[in-house]
A protein has these predicted regions:
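Surface-exposed loop/edge segments in extracytoplasmic proteins
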Residues: 86-89, 118-123
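Short, aromatic/His-centered strand-loop micro-motif at the edge of beta-sheets
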Residues: 77-101
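Flexible glycan-contacting loops in extracellular carbohydrate-active proteins
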Residues: 122-154
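Surface-exposed coil/turn segments at beta-strand junctions on protein surfaces, enriched
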Residues: 18, 95-97, 128
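Short tryptophan-centered beta-strand motifs in secreted/extracellular beta-sheet-rich domains
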Residues: 25, 98-114
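Secretory/extracellular carbohydrate-interaction modules
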Residues: 1-76
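Short beta-strand segments enriched in hydrophobic/aromatic residues
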Residues: 27-29, 80, 106
Length: 154
């Protein structure tokens, strides 16, 4: 998956999810995922997740990430909106190039995020119809250069 310089995300057609149960991916961040954008460095980029109608800023659950200039690692987060209120929780850091397995399990009352064995429960109720949320760089900043993430559905 490639995010071009000056954009937030690659163009993709929407993907409807009917009775979603599990989103699972094999993920490796490449050297191109290193960046320094100054004051916005702590903003959380989005990797993948599920959004619910009417809009994912109302209810959604995603795995987020950012690059840590000090450690040289990728920080990973649970990232969500619950009834319009945003939340996040740090999960772990991984090395550039390291292969990891990430998943989001959709349950009736909540979601379980699993980042290579580190699990976190997000109190956003699952719904019968949603849509796939794909990689997005930012906050409000666009990608400072082209970034490639090896993201393979499993």
């Amino acid at each position: 998956m490639k995010i071009q310089k000056g954009t937030h995300a690659p163009f993709r057609l929407p993907c409807l999810l009917i009775n979603p149960k599990l989103l699972a991916y094999r993920v490796a961040f490449t050297e191109s995922c290193r960046y320094d954008i100054g004051v916005g460095q702590g903003d959380i980029n989005k990797l993948f997740g599920v959004g619910y109608f009417p809009h994912h800023h109302d209810n959604s659950v995603r795995i987020g990430w950012n690059y840590d200039l000090v450690s040289g690692k990728i920080n990973l987060f649970a990232y969500w909106y619950a009834e319009g209120l945003r939340g996040w929780h740090y999960l772990r850091s991984v090395d550039i190039g390291e292969v990891n397995y990430f998943s989001i399990q959709v349950r009736e009352q909540d979601h379980i995020i699993d980042v290579s064995g580190r699990k976190y429960c997000v109190d956003v109720a699952g719904r019968s119809v949603g849509y796939l949320l794909r990689p997005y760089f930012g906050g409000n900043r666009t990608s400072p250069h082209t970034m490639i993430i090896d993201l393979q559905k499993i």
